[in-house]
């Protein structure tokens, strides 16, 4: 039942809030609430997983995790200073930024995630692809109860090298009895509060001004480059923004425009990025206070917060390491080299190093070393080509993609205060690494590093612009100048968000949903299905069952060598034999429109003559091979 899921999440968020209050007892609610959400989601990822490794991802493990977290919350509440309302003069500015984006985000989540329209599931442009994969991972973990999970998109033995804790935070609620939509969305709501709130608080802490924090917030979440210029030539081209498939001012590959809006193209469709930033942004806030404001006691809370980060979003963990290295160098250069100063850094590195190594050794780290097309050299992100040449001029590429923020980075850097420059030094380390090393088969995915560099750049540019315009005495001219800069820096993203809000795509039919429900109720949890390699395969996405060969758009970009599975899928449809079926452990065979459209010589008659028809609905038929 959904009520148990709400209570379960509330326990973790309450514990997170108690930790936030204990870490920063003098902070107002505008800090404690988003920071508490970050801690709460981190606990939700880490604690149930610890029990599930031993007991399986089942109800006993989840209940034990909740009991431990509830006990922690009670202990913290009893042993912390009594709760009192702390003056919070910046709260209004924060919520004035967060609430408008929260409304837009809630609407997009409503229309994009398993949105039931006339019996079918609909989605939006950005979720048409990735969400099908995330839904399948979430469901598979819940039905199999295995952690670390099996890799359900391929038959045979394959490592699950994807950061799966961004999925278990929803699998928890499926095990507790929630429906798929509720389970998918519940942890995302808390994560968005953390991402939006702590990005603002990071900017406020680093820049020392609520006004600068507001500008940095909008430059990051709604900033864009000059891609809108390509759509100003005619009314037809401009209208195409709102009707085409990925023809927006922030995602227009025909003109090498690829710097997407972080809300609609990263946070909503890509759960790893959302949950990674949910932990990373509060971590950066604590890093600043720990290092630059000399609150060394915060290392314990920082370590606790980031324990699950590598298996939530590996790119965010790497970004944090590089920023911490820059801050560590600052500590060595600019502060006394005493035990009181250096020991907290050593303890923080030791705790995270040991825990992260255990987490990553047989998962994402192993996959990065022996996966297909993973760790390799490559120049200039998506602008670089395999022959070493560039599609566009290096600086021209970033100018047209990032726009005003990129143009002002150099003056903003020299305008910044020394501590701000040191922090941005971590961003420069991220930029250099991401421009020369690729960590996955898809070069594009290095943007998950580049956006953290960009975040730090937005802080510096916001400070520069506010200081520049503060020197303009005439308030109307000051306001006009700021508005003009905001228009230039954000117009493309405004159009992109508008396009996303209007987008509506059919994803799964009523027959697909009915078939998935039947499979969920009647098929073995460890059953293997022979299906087409459609990325929308309902057997995997909706029922969470393992399939012989999933879509190449998923498995290739996870670094998997799936040649054998792909060939076996083709052979078992076109020239089936019982030996091959047994070899691959096939339990069920699906024939549907995807099979007949992608495999022209699919031989259903062979299966119909030998095996019972297990399920039929509309154009879909499933034959049971074993039993």
Region locations from a protein language model:
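Membrane-interface alpha helices of multi-pass inner-membrane proteins
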Residues: 264-267, 286, 299-314
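Hydrophobic, aromatic-rich transmembrane alpha-helices
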Residues: 282-290, 323-335, 400-421, 467
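Transmembrane alpha-helix segments characteristic
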Residues: 297-308, 323, 345-350, 416-438, ...
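Transmembrane alpha-helical segments
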Residues: 104-109, 222, 226, 312-316, ...
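Active-site lumenal/periplasmic loops and adjacent helix-entry segments of GT-C-fold
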Residues: 102-279, 315, 505-506, 533
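Membrane-embedded, hydrophobic transmembrane alpha-helices
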Residues: 1-91
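Hydrophobic/aromatic-rich transmembrane helices and adjacent perimembrane loops
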Residues: 189-192, 273, 318-321, 443-470
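Extracytoplasmic
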Residues: 473-627
């Amino acid at each position: 039942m959904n009520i148990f899921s709400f209570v379960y999440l509330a326990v973790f968020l309450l514990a997170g809030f108690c930790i936030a209050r204990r870490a920063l007892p003098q902070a107002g609610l505008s800090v404690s609430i988003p920071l508490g959400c970050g801690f709460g989601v981190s606990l939700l990822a880490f604690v149930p997983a610890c029990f599930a490794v031993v007991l399986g991802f089942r109800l006993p493990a989840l209940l034990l995790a909740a009991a431990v977290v509830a006990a922690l919350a009670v202990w913290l509440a009893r042993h912390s200073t009594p709760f009192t309302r702390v003056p919070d003069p910046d709260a209004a500015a924060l919520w004035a930024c967060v609430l408008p984006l929260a409304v837009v985000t809630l609407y997009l989540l409503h229309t994009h995630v398993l949105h039931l329209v006339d019996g079918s599931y609909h989605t939006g442009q950005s979720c048409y692809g990735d969400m099908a994969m995330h839904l399948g991972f979430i469901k598979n973990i819940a039905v199999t109860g295995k952690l670390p999970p099996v890799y359900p998109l391929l038959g045979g033995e394959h490592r699950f090298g994807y950061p799966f804790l961004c999925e278990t935070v929803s699998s928890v609620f499926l095990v507790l009895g929630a429906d798929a939509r509720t389970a998918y969305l519940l942890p995302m709501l808390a994560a968005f509060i953390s991402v939006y709130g702590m990005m603002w608080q990071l900017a406020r802490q680093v820049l020392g001004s609520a006004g600068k924090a507001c500008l940095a917030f909008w430059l990051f979440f709604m900033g864009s480059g000059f891609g809108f210029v390509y759509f100003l030539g005619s009314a037809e081209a401009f209208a195409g923004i709102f009707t085409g498939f990925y023809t927006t001012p922030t995602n227009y590959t025909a003109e090498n425009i690829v710097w997407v809006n972080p809300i609609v193209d990263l946070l909503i469709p890509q759960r790893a990025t959302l949950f990674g930033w949910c932990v990373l942004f509060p971590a950066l806030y604590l890093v600043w206070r720990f290092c630059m404001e000399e609150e060394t006691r915060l290392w314990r809370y920082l370590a606790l917060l980031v324990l699950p980060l590598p298996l939530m979003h590996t790119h965010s963990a790497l970004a944090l390491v590089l920023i911490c290295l820059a801050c560590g160098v600052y500590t060595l250069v600019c502060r006394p080299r005493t035990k009181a100063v250096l020991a907290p850094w050593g303890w923080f590195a030791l705790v995270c190093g040991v825990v992260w190594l255990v987490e990553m050794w047989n998962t994402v780290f192993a996959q990065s070393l022996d996966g297909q097309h993973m760790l390799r050299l490559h120049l200039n992100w998506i602008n670089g080509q395999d022959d070493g040449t560039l599609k566009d001029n290096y600086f021209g590429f970033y100018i047209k993609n990032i726009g005003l923020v990129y143009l002002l980075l150099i003056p903003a850097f020299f305008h910044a205060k020394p501590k701000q420059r040191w922090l941005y030094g971590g961003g420069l380390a991220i930029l250099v690494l991401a421009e020369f090393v690729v960590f996955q088969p898809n070069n594009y995915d290095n943007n998950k590093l580049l956006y953290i560099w960009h975040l730090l750049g937005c802080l510096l540019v916001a400070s520069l612009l506010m200081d520049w315009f503060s020197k303009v005495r005439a308030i109307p001219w000051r306001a006009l100048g700021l508005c003009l800069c905001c228009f230039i820096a954000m117009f493309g993203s405004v159009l992109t968000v508008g396009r996303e809000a209007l987008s509506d795509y059919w994803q799964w039919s009523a027959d697909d949903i009915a078939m998935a429900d039947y499979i969920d109720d009647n098929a073995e949890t460890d059953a293997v299905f022979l299906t087409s390699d459609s990325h929308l395969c309902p057997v995997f996405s909706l029922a969470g069952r393992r399939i012989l060969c999933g879509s190449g758009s998923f498995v290739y970009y996870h670094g998997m060598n799936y040649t054998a599975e792909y060939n076996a899928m083709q052979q078992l449809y076109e020239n089936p034999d019982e030996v091959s079926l047994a070899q691959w452990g096939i339990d069920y065979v699906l024939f549907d429109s995807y099979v007949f459209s992608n495999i022209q010589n699919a031989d259903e008659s062979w299966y119909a003559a030998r095996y019972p028809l297990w399920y039929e609905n509309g154009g879909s038929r499933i034959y049971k091979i074993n039993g």
